[in-house]
A protein has these predicted regions:
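Short, solvent-exposed loop/turn segments at conserved positions within beta-propeller repeat blades
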Residues: 33-38, 62, 85-92, 118, ...
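Long, well-ordered mid-to-C-terminal structural blocks that present hydrophobic/aromatic surfaces
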Residues: 123-142
Length: 142
């Protein structure tokens, strides 16, 4: 990348970046518009030119702040985690996106347990050697 930025279009608070198979960059942006509103993912050129974006908002009842990003090229998917750097709420979901269109395909709630807080604030994910399985940590080390 040849320049730095803090905002692209209406998206702000960029967090994680990854290089797409086509050479472009995909990034999670925690917010869109005002402070601490639901963000999304943004694709831009290696030179930093905005290309397209997709919102992470599902509905008002689900607290989403895109954080980590994992590419799964074998399945043409992008996985994003949900952790709020402003610490105004807790995330309990991950999101699955189509890598080609950036369409948000699914928002999945993490499983919870009665005695442990293992579903709170998923953050950094990793693609395993099979090229299909993604594992991620949660704030409570779940």
């Amino acid at each position: 990348m040849s320049k730095s930025f803090g905002k692209i279009k209406e998206y702000s608070f960029p967090h994680s970046y990854s290089e797409l198979p086509n050479g472009n960059i995909i990034s999670t942006f925690q917010t869109k518009g005002g402070i601490n509103t639901v963000g999304g993912i943004v694709e831009f050129s290696p030179e930093g030119k905005y290309l397209r974006s997709s919102d992470a908002e599902v509905d008002e009842t689900i607290f989403m702040r895109p954080y980590g990003i994992v590419l799964v090229p074998k399945l043409n998917k992008i996985i994003t985690t949900n952790y709020d750097m402003h610490e105004t709420g807790n995330g309990y979901h991950i999101q699955i996106w189509d890598m080609t269109s950036l369409e948000l395909l699914q928002t999945l709630k993490l499983p919870s347990t009665k005695d442990l807080i293992i579903d709170q604030n998923p953050f950094e994910g990793r693609l395993l050697a099979d090229g299909e399985t993604v594992m991620f940590q949660t704030f409570s080390c779940g």
